[in-house]
Amino acid sequence: MIVVKIGGSVVCKDASKVIQNLPKYADRAVVIHGGGCLVNELLKRMGIEPKFLTHPGGLVSRYTDWETLKVFVMAMGWINKYIVASLHGLGVQALGLTGADLGVVVAKRKERVLVIDERGRQRVVDGGYVGKIAEIRVDKLTPPPLKVLAPVAVSEKGELLNIDGDQLAFDVAREAKAERLILLSDVEGLILGGKVVPRLTPEEAEKLVKSEEVRGGMKRKLLMASEAAKLGIEVVISSGLVDSPIDAALNGAGTHIIKNI
């Protein structure tokens, strides 16, 4: 099995090339998507300014209060069904899910989180409606049909929760014992010194996470990739905006994080 994560940057720019490439892998893939840019757009239309939290180590997450949660679920629902409908137009039977459907992804709500405030001090704040994944029913994700999964989980109390899409992709890949995890974004891979880094070991990825060379979402991707590679899963970070992006990733494009290079 392969796990394909369609990043929000791809979803909001042009996901058509990924979608057109998916029929080739419909019998052995699970698709997970993001869509934070649409969440931001809808929030601003409603007069709500998106809020983000910076955590120790430089990782950034969305602060999700009740109103933001409603917009988050709405945006992810639209993206999910857009992908499913597009696949239907290509003759692929696909099933769009959130983690709440069939209890596919159960998470525990983070009631408190540690953040770095604007003065650089650590403090504990309310966690909002953000979850830490506790269980994935991977048997419900096995094709056929091709499953398209949104990063929305359910708690044991029946709460809808925002979960990180990259973390979800990693957890699905781990539980499914996937051969490869493909993270598609709007960049060609990890770029250092103006060039794409073609190969990394898990240890090299970990060092970069701790350095100042890598920032934002790439830091989280490398952290997840390092953990996955240690389990024997090959991780590819590459562009979802090129022709046949899944083919390209499997044929050497992007940055490959592999246990033994």
UniProtKB/Swiss-Prot annotation:
Species of the source: Pyrobaculum aerophilum (strain ATCC 51768 / DSM 7523 / JCM 9630 / CIP 104966 / NBRC 100827 / IM2)
The name this protein goes by in its record: Putative [LysW]-aminoadipate/[LysW]-glutamate kinase
Record-linked InterPro entries: AceGlu_kinase-like_sf, AcgluKinase_fam, Asp/Glu/Uridylate_kinase, LysZ
Alphabetic keyword roster: Amino-acid biosynthesis, Arginine biosynthesis, ATP-binding, Cytoplasm, Kinase, Lysine biosynthesis, Nucleotide-binding, Transferase
Site, as annotated: Transition state stabilizer: 5, 221
Pathway entry: Amino-acid biosynthesis; L-lysine biosynthesis via AAA pathway; L-lysine from L-alpha-aminoadipate (Thermus route): step 2/5; Amino-acid biosynthesis; L-arginine biosynthesis
GO cellular component: cytoplasm
Family: Belongs to the acetylglutamate kinase family. LysZ subfamily.
Gene: lysZ
Location relative to the cell: Cytoplasm
Residue sites binding substrate per the record: 35-36, 62, 162
PANTHER family: N-ACETYLGLUTAMATE SYNTHASE (PTHR23342), N-ACETYLGLUTAMATE SYNTHASE, MITOCHONDRIAL (PTHR23342:SF0)
Keyword Transferase part of the UniProt annotation: yes
GO biological process, one term: lysine biosynthetic process via aminoadipic acid
Domain of life: Archaea
